[in-house]
Swiss-Prot record:
Record key words, sorted: Ribonucleoprotein, Ribosomal protein
Protein's UniProt name: Large ribosomal subunit protein eL42
Cellular component, GO, one term: ribosome
Pfam families: Ribosomal_L44 (PF00935)
Keyword Translocase: no
Gene Ontology biological process terms in this record: translation
Organism from which the protein derives: Debaryomyces hansenii (strain ATCC 36239 / CBS 767 / BCRC 21394 / JCM 1990 / NBRC 0083 / IGC 2968)
Top-level lineage group: Eukaryota
């Protein structure tokens, strides 16, 4: 299990800062896919009418986890940066710190 604190002091690339400042940490989440992106418009047009599925549907899934991406927002200048972590099954943001001799809880 990976437990990441909700704030961290790290380097800020913003024009005003360019030094280590406090950052607010959140987990990145992919936005909703646009219906008007060129690929989606082309796909929808191709799918129209008779003829069933026109493009291959991917079935050979190999990965069991996704890489965790952190979104760091500078408290001073509000500049946002992204930082990817390694793959993990369990990710926690701002959870309780681990105590010695304590049982694992999921």
């Amino acid at each position: 299990m990976v437990n990441v604190p909700k704030t961290r002091r790290t380097y800020c690339k913003g024009k005003e800062c360019r030094k280590h400042t406090q950052h607010k940490v959140t987990q990145y989440k992919a936005g909703k896919a646009s219906l008007f992106a060129q690929g989606k418009r082309r796909y929808d047009r191709k799918q129209k009418g008779y003829g069933g599925q026109t493009k291959p549907v991917f079935h050979k899934k190999a990965k069991t986890t996704k890489k965790v991406v952190l979104r760091l927002e500078c408290v001073v200048c509000k500049t946002k940066a992204q930082l990817s972590l390694k793959r993990c099954k369990h990710f926690e943001l701002g959870g309780d710190k681990k105590q010695k001799g304590q049982a694992l809880q999921f």
